[in-house]
Amino acid sequence: MKYDRPIIALDFPDKEKTFEFLKKFPEDEKLFVKVGMELFYSEGSDMVKELISEGHDVFLDLKLHDIPNTVKQAMKVIGKLGVKLTTVHISGGSEMLIAAKEGLLDGANGDTNTKILGITQLTSTDEEMVKNEQKLSISLKESVKNYAKIAQKSGLDGVVCSAEESDMIYKLTGDDFLRITPGIRLAGGDVGDQKRVMTPDAAARNHSSGIVVGRAITKAENPLDSYRLVTKLWREK
């Protein structure tokens, strides 16, 4: 499975800045957008509802990580929103992941198109952090592979991973298990605080199911032109 449109990360502090950005696109252009912690904590679920009411698809990226019951109750709320994607940390364990799925279904009365993705390792993580801070005896890629297996076994719909690992997960889990990849940059673009990055066309060749693009579009001189370029590269491989 592959999402046709790049997912634009709306990394803005408030509603005003968000819609100022969205006005740079044609009114009939329906986007796939990601609402993360900053925007959600600033504007709440009303922001999500407004984006959906305007015809946009929403990836609500809150990376839930808590005891199973707390995550289940939070997912009940998310289940009512009608977002396309949402996230939990796989490191919370299989019991938490199963509870997340149950909560989502409960919130949507058993009928939902929302897919839950598990966070493997953040794209800001590198081998040194895995070894010295997380104290894992396996490599970063082996850690990602292990998390992907846990997520699939627990009933999640896919994972968030670096595009460097998407082909590995594709071979491990099959094509129906989603591989959504942030850390996407145009050639020569600023990588910021992300350490594992890739271009849109390379991510497509590496079996990413969907790409999340932030600064390459939101900070561009002409966001619409950048969006068109990213979309072209993503679709053509």
From Swiss-Prot:
SMART domains: OMPdecase (SM00934). Gene3D superfamilies: Aldolase class I. Substrate binds at residues 11, 34, 61-70, 123, 185, 194, 214-215. GO terms for molecular function: orotidine-5'-phosphate decarboxylase activity. Keywords: Decarboxylase, Lyase, Pyrimidine biosynthesis. GO terms for biological process: 'de novo' pyrimidine nucleobase biosynthetic process; 'de novo' UMP biosynthetic process. Pathway: Pyrimidine metabolism; UMP biosynthesis via de novo pathway; UMP from orotate: step 2/2. Homodimer. Catalyzes the decarboxylation of orotidine 5'-monophosphate (OMP) to uridine 5'-monophosphate (UMP). Belongs to the OMP decarboxylase family. Type 1 subfamily. This is Orotidine 5'-phosphate decarboxylase. It comes from Ligilactobacillus salivarius (strain UCC118) (Lactobacillus salivarius).
